[in-house]
């Protein structure tokens, strides 16, 4: 390969890593915010402690909210030169050979040179079709519609630019939001990343799961005694509750 020419695999890996970073960040910011409110509403001692340091917590909550909308804007940006969800899916659909069994075997061989299990492993690997990529594109398009219908305007007019001149106008925009819808949107981005990662790294069919997304459901998962690996949103919920528990004087 010529110097300076980036391979399709390297481009896809780069875009996938950007998407991982941004989708995780969106989950961290959102679930820190919603977990804070859920936890504070449940406990008088915590509310009292928070109110004693109201300036700090208002600053932190404002930062979570601003950062969430900014990172969602990055993910759904339509500029093809930026690191976006569109660019990630374009790299995948335009370079299907990177998902072939041969390409998977080469990647596994680089990771584990000298092993003899790879040949048998890749025989069962899933090779995506155009229908698979079209399905992923439809899924992403549906999520984009949710973002653009309500949340894009808030991102542009409230957080990224000073396009709103009054509190009344700002409140009118936020009145159109739905916290459950926003939770589903953010969690779905992580599931899309997981589907693409499993396809590329392990040769598994890209399936979008429907995981728990409410704070209550994530709290129940956190109390399980099995050895499951927590999602970023579950970890954020658990850590937020743990931090706020320090205020509990009851």
Predicted regions and their residues:
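Amphipathic alpha-helical interface segments
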Residues: 1-146, 172-250
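Histidine-centered, metal-coordinating catalytic motifs and their short helical/loop contexts
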Residues: 141-168
